[in-house]
Amino acid sequence: MKFLLLFLLASSTFAQTAPPRLIVRGDDMGYSHAGNEAILKCFQEGIVTSIEVIVPSPWFPEAVKMLAEIPTADVGIHLALSSEWDNVKWRPVSDCPSLRDADGYFYPMIFPNKNYPGRALAENPWKIEDVEKEFRAQIELALKKIPRISHLSHHMGCSALSPEVRALAKKLAKEYHIDIDPAELGVTNVRYQGPSKTSEDKLQSFLKMLESLQPGKTYLFVDHPGLDTAEVRAIHHVGYENVAADRQGVTDTWTHPRVREFIREKGIQLISYQDLKNQTRSR
């Protein structure tokens, strides 16, 4: 009992003195050329530690080339079963009829959306065997092109389509040895603490979030870098029309000198999914 109490006391002391750890995840690489450039910029000049790539997206081939230029970047497969934008679309990479709309694209939404009635995957007769076929095809293509893939994530929450899909995604992650689940490792998701409409809003709310991080705990912050270019201004869907300005704000925040300075001052340790996996193995 004495030794147990000493161990618990030592663990508690370590948790209080260890720095906060933060994964900064940039999602949706591949949806546009400018999006690819933004993620590259946020990794090279900013604080991004993990990058999520959408395999069926139109700019995936360019993403593969860009990721080869940054071999130390941690990369995850952002499994996708939807194609949400009105002016740019992507299709499954496998033969999975129940996941396609009448034009052969993924449905724009995963869950029912008043702006897209009847056009959510959940509202249509999808089949689990098609989901498995598509997930496997995306994973295998990603591993072929980017062998260092470390983990999976899920675009627009597609794994929440049903408990069956969630279990399938977990099974495949283990089968392909890319099973890192932050939730199972005690990682806390964090968001902007305050308004996030403009670049300045994002910056101040991100700094406020950083200020709230506690010693000894591990956190995950997710957003979508982009650039305010003509290309991205043409990418939108009903209910999210300001994509370019919004995602430029993410890039501005993640590359802002004040953010890096604050992280250094507070002693926050930036880590990746792969770091999380390595640290778990070493325990």
Regions picked out by a protein language model, each given a short descriptive name:
Residues 122-207, 211-214:
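Catalytic domains of cell-wall/extracellular-matrix polysaccharide-remodeling enzymes
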Residues 39-45, 62-74, 91-105, 143-144, ...:
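Acidic (Asp/Glu)-rich catalytic clusters
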Residues 180-183, 239-283:
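C-terminal domain-boundary segment and adjacent tail
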